[in-house]
């Protein structure tokens, strides 16, 4: 059986309660509520005072017992003081029981108080919780991202290239619907690199086609990021916007496409310049002489009269020019020519010893032919 007795004494007013015609019902309810709130506040205040008094009394009892114990343990403690503390402890325990009784009476009184509109119910929840998508975990390391990209490309490179060659919106949407795994960052990264490769190879028309598909994938990824959803769940929304001729969206797409193509051209130019520098450095290293000097650089650093001697390949003319120069300068320039491999002592005569420094009076030198785009200045 359900006990309904708890409902017998509820201090609430019904809107249908009869009141005197000269009494405003709303005001009457307001006065009753105010009086009820004041009674509740007074009751709560008395309860808090009793609680504080009880705690203070318990603290005094504990303090008195501590002093009593210390005095009993101490040798030569005063008997008079001991008796006084015992009497005080006994009195405090009586007060403690009195406070506890008052608190118990207060609890009973609170339990028997009639319910009202303010105490009928209590908040079950003070806040609402909504499940949200967890924040993306910390980005993987550079090596992990590179490995992920490499694995993805090895598996789907053919499909990515097929997507990059598509022209029509409908074809792109259908292909992504059939190969939804392509809607990801790895596809976009591969298309970007492919665009740069095509520009380096001077396949400009094909680069512009692939650049268009690259921006399609980039816009899908940006849309997913703004909606905070998986790109595979929103790529159809991108095509819907584009195909319904959303003018502002289309203009934004075209602007980003042109900016992307300019960036691709810039990156391709930098790559070509870097490759040229690397090639030139390799060629320079190949032509370094036995002393580690570049013959082209040495030739360009020679005085004009010595350069003419190399241009006409005339040994006698070179010896005459050297004899007219300052001996120190002549020795410096000829030693650089030998270290660069531009000239070597005449091995046929055997008169020039290996490793001997060349000077103005060294007549036994022969030109060494140079390969490639270097000047052929052999005697």
From Swiss-Prot:
Family, per entry: Belongs to the CDC37 family.
Location of the region described as Disordered in the Swiss-Prot/TrEMBL record: 123-146, 344-379
InterPro entries found in the cross-reference section: Cdc37, Cdc37_C, Cdc37_Hsp90-bd, Cdc37_Hsp90-bd_sf, Cdc37_N_dom
SMART domains: CDC37_C (SM01069), CDC37_M (SM01070), CDC37_N (SM01071)
Protein name per its UniProtKB record: Hsp90 co-chaperone Cdc37
Role, per record: Co-chaperone that binds to numerous kinases and promotes their interaction with the Hsp90 complex, resulting in stabilization and promotion of their activity. Inhibits HSP90AA1 ATPase activity.
Locations listed in the record: Cytoplasm
PTM annotation (N-acetylmethionine): residues: 1
Modified positions (Phosphothreonine) in chain numbering: 119
GO term, biological process aspect, one: regulation of type I interferon-mediated signaling pathway
């Amino acid at each position: 059986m359900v006990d309904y007795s708890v409902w017998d004494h509820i201090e609430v007013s019904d809107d249908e309660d009869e009141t005197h015609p000269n009494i405003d019902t709303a005001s009457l309810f307001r006065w009753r509520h105010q009086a009820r709130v004041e009674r509740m506040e007074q009751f709560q205040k008395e309860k808090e005072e009793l609680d504080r008094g009880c705690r203070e009394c318990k603290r005094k009892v504990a303090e008195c017992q501590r002093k009593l114990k210390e005095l009993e343990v101490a040798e030569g403690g005063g008997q008079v003081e001991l008796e006084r503390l015992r009497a005080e402890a006994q009195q405090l325990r009586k007060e403690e029981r009195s406070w506890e009784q008052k608190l118990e009476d207060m609890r009973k009184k609170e339990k028997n108080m009639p319910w009202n509109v303010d105490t009928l119910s209590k908040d079950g929840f003070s806040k609402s919780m909504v499940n949200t998508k967890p924040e993306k975990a910390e980005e993987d390391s550079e090596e992990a991202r590179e490995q992920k990209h490499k694995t993805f490309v090895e598996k789907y490179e053919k499909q990515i290239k097929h997507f990059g060659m598509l022209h029509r919106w409908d074809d792109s949407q259908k292909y992504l619907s059939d190969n939804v795994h392509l809607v990801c960052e790895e596809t976009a990264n591969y298309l970007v690199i492919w665009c740069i490769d095509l520009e380096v190879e001077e396949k400009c028309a094909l680069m512009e086609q692939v650049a268009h598909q690259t921006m399609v994938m980039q816009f899908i990824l940006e849309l997913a990021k703004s909606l905070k959803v998986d790109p595979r769940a929103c790529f159809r929304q991108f095509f819907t916007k584009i195909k319904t001729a959303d003018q502002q969206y289309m203009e934004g797409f075209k602007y980003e496409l042109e900016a992307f193509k300019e960036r691709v051209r810039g990156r391709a130019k930098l790559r070509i310049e870097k490759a040229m520098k690397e090639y030139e450095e390799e060629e320079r290293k190949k032509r370094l002489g036995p002393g580690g000097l570049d013959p082209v650089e040495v030739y360009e650093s020679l005085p004009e009269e010595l350069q003419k001697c190399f241009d006409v390949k005339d040994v006698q003319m070179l010896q005459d020019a050297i004899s007219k120069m300052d001996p120190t300068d002549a020795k410096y320039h000829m030693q650089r020519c030998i270290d660069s491999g531009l000239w070597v002592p005449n091995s046929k005569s055997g008169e020039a010893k290996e490793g001997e420094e060349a000077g103005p009076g060294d007549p036994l030198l022969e030109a060494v032919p140079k390969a490639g785009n270097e000047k052929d200045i052999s005697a």
